[in-house]
């Protein structure tokens, strides 16, 4: 869905069995799509695209499947409107489809009510098109994939405690990454990690998994429960920590999971309950 969305915005993407070749068009190079962009079941996709398109000089409609059209969008629409974005949607912009009319954006100081990488990332993308320095403050650190990717492309970010600062209209420092290797998804690996932990006699190694510390709360919880988990061959790819995860079966004990671990464990709670 993300690839089709950018193709509809005029980006050339060549796909082969093992890689995508993307021909960048620069900050202002996207073009108005001929119809609505369908984000399917991707909440991340529709929210990040809303931020990206808020500063463009054309009109876009973003929609998704039935479940996406029921999910709340107000948490990104409200701060984007504060930046000057023109966004309309069902229930005053609370629900998709969202109609985004590109506008001249201005920097804001925004304090997010929740630790949300989707809110943060939508605002960081919009901030690239805004006049001035945008500040985004979170109550706790959320996933930082966007910040790491920005920095790998030479986009300057600064952190002051729980606040991120980014300057709009960056004119220097950009660099095209000749090759990005996307590590294995930790949420997908979580099922094998738990399975190997609870099935007697297991000894499993899962290779090339992203182990970003803002994503791996499950490892912290399982280790406290007595799991036998090792991170091998640790390295960094495109700013992201990567490792091979070796898991051997172990007897576990119950633990209490506090609010400090919720953001980095949220997607793994169903399998953690097993």
What kind of region is each of these model predictions?
Residues 1-274:
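Structural preference for solvent-exposed beta-strand-turn elements
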């Amino acid at each position: 869905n993300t690839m089709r969305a950018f193709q509809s915005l005029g980006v050339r993407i060549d796909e082969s069995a093992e890689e995508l070749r993307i021909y960048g068009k620069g900050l202002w190079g996207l073009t108005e799509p001929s119809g609505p962009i369908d984000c399917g079941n991707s909440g991340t996709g529709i929210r990040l695209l809303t931020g990206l398109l808020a500063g463009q000089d054309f009109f876009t409609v973003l929609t998704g499947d039935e479940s996406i059209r029921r999910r709340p969008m107000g948490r990104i629409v409200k701060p984007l409107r504060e930046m000057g974005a023109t966004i309309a949607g069902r229930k005053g912009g609370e629900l998709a489809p969202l109609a985004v009319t590109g506008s001249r954006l201005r920097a804001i100081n925004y304090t997010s009510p929740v630790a949300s990488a989707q809110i943060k990332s939508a605002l960081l993308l919009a901030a690239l098109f805004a006049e001035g320095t945008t500040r985004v403050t979170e109550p706790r650190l959320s996933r930082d994939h966007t910040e790491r990717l920005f920095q790998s492309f030479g986009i300057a970010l600064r952190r002051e405690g729980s606040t991120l600062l980014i300057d709009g209209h960056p004119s220097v420092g950009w660099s095209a990454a000749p090759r990005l290797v996307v590590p294995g998804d930790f949420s997908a690996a979580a099922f094998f990690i738990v399975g190997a932990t609870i099935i007697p006699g297991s000894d499993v190694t899962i290779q090339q998994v992203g182990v970003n510390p803002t994503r791996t709360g499950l490892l912290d919880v399982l280790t406290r429960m007595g799991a036998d988990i090792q991170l091998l061959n640790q390295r960094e790819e495109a700013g992201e920590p990567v490792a091979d995860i070796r898991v051997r079966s172990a007897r576990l004990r119950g633990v209490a999971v506090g609010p400090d671990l919720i953001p980095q464990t949220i997607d793994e709670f169903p399998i953690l309950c097993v």
